[in-house]
Structure formats: C-alpha cells, structure tokens
Amino acid sequence: RYSALPRMLLSVWMLPRTDAAKRAAVSSGGQEGAALRLSTLAEDGQLGRGALPRAVGETMTDLLENGCACVPALALDESGLLLERGCGVLVHGGLAGWLEGDAARGMELLEGQGTGTVELSGGRAVEVTEVRLRWTPEADGGRVTGAGLVCRLTARLEEGAAAPEKEELEGLERELAARSEGCIRAALDSLQSRNADCLSLTRRLAALRPMARADRERFGTWELTAEVRAEVTRGE
C-alpha cells in the first residue's frame, strides 16, 4: 500500500529563480554534490548554527494552522554552490517575501536557534551557546493586543582570545544584546508587515492567557516588544 509518510518527512528549502548556468552547475554537482550540501545545512540547523530545517509535513501543518510558514531559503553562487539565504515566507497565495540579513538572524533567534560565532567590535568574537525565550502576552478587553519578549543569550569569548577587563566584557555584552535585539526587531517587523504569524504566537499567547482571545488576523497590529539580555563569559 502506498504511503505518503516518507515524503512528508523530507526536508524542504526554497530557491529563488536563477539562471540556467547556475542550475546546470547544481545538476552536475557544483563544488560539492547538492545532496551532500543539503545534508550539511540540515545538520547545521539541527545544531543551532543556522536555519532549522523544515519537513514537508511541518510546513503544511503551519500553513493550515497559522496561514503561513517560514521555510529556509538557499541561494547559488557563481559555481553553483548552495548557500544559506535566510528564509522565505509562504502564505496560502504563494510566496509573500524573504527574510534576509538581520531579519533572518532575528528569525533564528526567535525560533531558539542562533548559536554559533558572532563577530563584535575591536576584533572580538563570541560564541553564542544558548538562546532562551520568554513571551508575556498583553491583553485589553478580553483580547490579546500584543506581547513582550525577553531573550537571554549565553555566550563565551572564543578560545585563545586575550582575557578582557570587566568593563570591556560588559561592553561586549551590551553590544551583543543590542545587535541581537535589532535583528529580532527586524524579523518581527517583517512578519507583521505581512501579517504572517510564522512563530505560532497566536496559539502560544492564547495558551498563556486562556481568558483572552488571540485573533490571528490581528497579528500585524499587535504591539510586540523585545528585550535581549546577554551574558558573556571568558573562554577557557
């Protein structure tokens, strides 16, 4: 008996329209086989070092329950090598747009991802090792009107880096927090401009405030605030 289950478990990526030469490079393997490259990207996502891979079934469920879905996107370089390109926002009518750059980084953080190396000023770099999120819904008149997010980042200086003084360490924490907060803000603004609740906030906030009604259609009008707190420790 035919079963669609294996197909529903396959990971899905989005790739923008590109020229024939680049498509041919991918078909011939490029610098490395497409299958191997996709496997590497999926593994990085599972380890929190990139966009979390999405299965076909998960994507379809998000479209049914949220009216939208955020799917990891890829781009091709001149040789046909597949590179991460943020994510695409799908709605029932098709592609609503892309999250790239800061917005893509913000989306990773909003999904509890985003671990890995972050370059900071002064030639410093930190490795984000943990991302924790806490949403607090806001309601008025029995209806959810917004939410506040507190995102806590734990990071450490890269191994071999000179130990900083306390004042410099605190400065790195402020810089990491401010930069990450800007990325989260960019992602939230992009999603709200499309009224695309790819974070399932409607259902999550309804569970946190069961006496208040959370309308998915009003997601774009909610007041969403974000605060990032970072803790940076000295590398061993």
Question: Where are the regions a protein language model picked out?
Answer:
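A glycine-rich, acidic short-motif signal
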Residues: 1-236
